[in-house]
Amino acid sequence: MPRVKVFFDITIGGKKGGRIVMELYNDIVPKTAENFRALCTGEKGKGKSGKKLHFKGSKFHRIIPEFMIQGGDFTEGNGTGGESIHGEKFDDENFKEKHTGPGVLSMANCGANTNGSQFFLCTVKTTWLDGKHVVFGKVIEGMDVVKAIESKGSEDGAPSAPCVIADCGEMK
């Protein structure tokens, strides 16, 4: 089964930041990968929240240098919201893949089996997250854009400039 590739076109402080291309592990975590892919395309329409199930226009709301950049809350925009294509939350699929270094794509959660739409991209190796967060892909192009977003972060995670997913979708 070929791995799916998706993209984010990023703006940083209202200016073009570049493109991040990610490969999804649809062969290892199909449910998690499909959730992310469909949230990139927006093809599922509106969710239970009444908001479109789509990352387009959402922000990286939590950016911690030398750790990760977190986004995917398209309902509230502050880390308290988001929802999956499978309903509000869904279970951890498996923990086969690990947080091995920069570019790892993983699900953000608030405990076991609470996956929604929030995700993070690691900027360093984060082994303490293994077995707690489902890794479902990796950056294959645009780590420079990830680093540019990371540079707008702070110790408490508050961004110094808006880092927005201006457009997103599936690579064909």
From Swiss-Prot:
What function does the entry list?
PPIases accelerate the folding of proteins. It catalyzes the cis-trans isomerization of proline imidic peptide bonds in oligopeptides.
UniProt KW keywords: Isomerase, Rotamase
For this record, the Gene Ontology CC terms, alphabetical, are: cytoplasm
Question: InterPro entries, per this entry?
Answer: Cyclophilin-like_dom_sf, Cyclophilin-type_PPIase, Cyclophilin-type_PPIase_CS, Cyclophilin-type_PPIase_dom
**Pfam entry (one):** Pro_isomerase
Q: Which residues form a coiled coil?
A: none
Q: Does the keyword Translocase apply?
A: no
- Broad enzyme group: isomerase
Q: Which family does it belong to?
A: Belongs to the cyclophilin-type PPIase family.
Q: Which terms in the Gene Ontology molecular function aspect does this entry carry?
A: cyclosporin A binding; peptidyl-prolyl cis-trans isomerase activity
What protein does this entry describe?
Peptidyl-prolyl cis-trans isomerase 2
Q: Its catalytic activity? A: [protein]-peptidylproline (omega=180) = [protein]-peptidylproline (omega=0)
| Organism whose genome encodes this protein | Caenorhabditis elegans
- Give residue ranges for domain PPIase cyclophilin-type: 7-170
- Name a biological process GO annotation: protein folding
Q: Write the Enzyme Commission number(s) for this entry.
A: 5.2.1.8
